[in-house]
């Protein structure tokens, strides 16, 4: 069954942006953690850098997932659901720890940057749901 979503090209382009954002963010923090933490953000390195790098690697992998969605939105719709959960958890944790737990404020910036993606992903799922029911 061939499906076609209204504004499909716009949705596809936004998934490409989401993929590139997570690819770049994950790669940069994985490969250049010391430079960004100590050099740019003036933060000490974490006691166990592998935990930070594992999180960065997961962000990169989510970029791969969003690229799959870009390539075929209908076959990979469950990746969008995982993306919403992933970004909600990061945003919630970042905001909580910035405001209540002493986490450096810079990490909330990425939470704010994730908010439009969360909204976009939800709009996409609702639009696909309407198309399936129609």
Region annotations inferred by a language model:
Residues 20-30, 47-70, 82-89:
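Core segments of alpha-helical transmembrane spans in multipass integral membrane proteins
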Residues 27-30, 67, 95-98, 119-125:
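Membrane-embedded alpha-helical segments of multi-pass transporters/permeases
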Residues 116-134:
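Membrane-water interface at the C-terminal end of transmembrane alpha helices
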Residues 8-50:
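Membrane-helix boundary elements
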Residues 40-49, 78-81, 103-113:
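Non-cytosolic membrane-interface motifs at loop->transmembrane helix junctions
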Residues 4, 64-78, 98:
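Juxtamembrane helix-break-helix junctions at the cytosolic face
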Residues 91-109:
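Membrane-helix boundary connector in multi-pass membrane proteins
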